[in-house]
């Protein structure tokens, strides 16, 4: 049976707050891919999962508001990385679990999301490809926000280092899993579009 927010309440955080340096400073979540903004592809997948959809963004708030129940912004406008967005999201999340995804991964599918949700518990659940963890594809118990706040105040800014202290549960994915592709350069956007067209033809 597919997971829905009626059967498994969770918050969802979509991270849209980066500088977009590889995209020439453009806001990645609003870049068009196959006729729609990148954020729209993620929204389509996660909207049925939650009544608490949070977007972390530092600009273009009016455009992002269409895709969220809540918008959060980093306290510091100095772009301190994705952990800042996770911290802001955890501070306002309504549910005991929070699903986290980056805005530039439009190939994420329901099967991957359900695999993360199926392992919900007291520890973070994080995608792993071989020996490499993908810390921005994860499910976090919001009870960990005090632990995160303590480390943040001590200067920690790496999601990877934070998770490593918490014995995360792994959701194993192949090294070349296309669902985890971050389309964060113009070349990657174009290549992924061609690949998707080829699969559909």
UniProtKB/Swiss-Prot annotation:
Reactions that this protein is recorded to catalyse: Mo-molybdopterin + GTP + H(+) = Mo-molybdopterin guanine dinucleotide + diphosphate
GO annotation (BP), single: bis(molybdopterin guanine dinucleotide)molybdenum biosynthetic process
Source domain of life: Bacteria
InterPro entries, A to Z: MobA-like_NTP_Trfase (IPR025877), Molybde_CF_guanTrfase (IPR013482), Nucleotide-diphossugar_trans (IPR029044)
Residues where Mg(2+) binds: 104
Localization: Cytoplasm
Metal-binding listed as a keyword: yes
Pfam families listed in its UniProt record: NTP_transf_3
Keywords: Cytoplasm, GTP-binding, Magnesium, Metal-binding, Molybdenum cofactor biosynthesis, Nucleotide-binding, Transferase
Sequence positions that bind GTP: 15-17, 28, 74, 104
GO cellular component, one term: cytoplasm
Top enzyme category: transferase
GO molecular-function terms, A-Z: GTP binding; metal ion binding; molybdenum cofactor guanylyltransferase activity
E.C. code: 2.7.7.77
Cofactor: Mg(2+)
Principal cellular location given in the protein's record: cytoplasm
Alphabetical list of CDD domains matching this protein: MobA
NCBIfam families (UniProt xref): molyb_mobA
Stored PANTHER family: MOLYBDENUM COFACTOR GUANYLYLTRANSFERASE
Functional summary from the UniProt entry: Transfers a GMP moiety from GTP to Mo-molybdopterin (Mo-MPT) cofactor (Moco or molybdenum cofactor) to form Mo-molybdopterin guanine dinucleotide (Mo-MGD) cofactor.
Similarity remark: Belongs to the MobA family.
Domain remark in the UniProt entry: The N-terminal domain determines nucleotide recognition and specific binding, while the C-terminal domain determines the specific binding to the target protein.
Subunit (UniProt): Monomer.
Name the UniProt record assigns to this protein: Molybdenum cofactor guanylyltransferase
Species whose genome carries this gene: Ectopseudomonas mendocina (strain ymp)
Lineage, broadest ranks: Bacteria, Pseudomonadati, Pseudomonadota, Gammaproteobacteria, Pseudomonadales
């Amino acid at each position: 049976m597919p997971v829905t927010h009626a059967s498994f309440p969770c918050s969802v955080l979509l991270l849209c707050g980066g500088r977009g340096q590889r995209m020439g400073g453009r806001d990645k979540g609003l870049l068009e891919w196959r006729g729609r903004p990148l954020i729209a592809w993620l929204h389509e997948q996660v909207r049925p999962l939650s009544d608490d959809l949070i977007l972390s963004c530092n600009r273009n708030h009016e455009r992002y508001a269409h895709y969220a129940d809540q918008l959060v912004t980093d306290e510091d406008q100095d772009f301190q990385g994705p952990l800042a967005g996770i911290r802001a999201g955890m501070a306002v999340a309504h549910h005991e679990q929070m699903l986290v995804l980056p805005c530039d991964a439009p190939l994420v599918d329901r099967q991957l999301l359900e695999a993360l949700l199926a392992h919900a518990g007291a520890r973070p659940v994080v995608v792993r490809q071989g020996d490499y963890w993908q810390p921005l594809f994860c499910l976090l118990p919001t009870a960990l926000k005090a632990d995160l706040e303590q480390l943040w105040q001590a200067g920690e800014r790496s999601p990877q280092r934070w998770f490593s202290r918490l014995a995360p549960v792994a959701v194993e994915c192949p090294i070349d899993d296309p669902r985890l592709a971050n389309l964060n350069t113009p070349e990657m956007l174009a290549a992924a579009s061609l690949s998707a067209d080829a699969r559909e033809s």
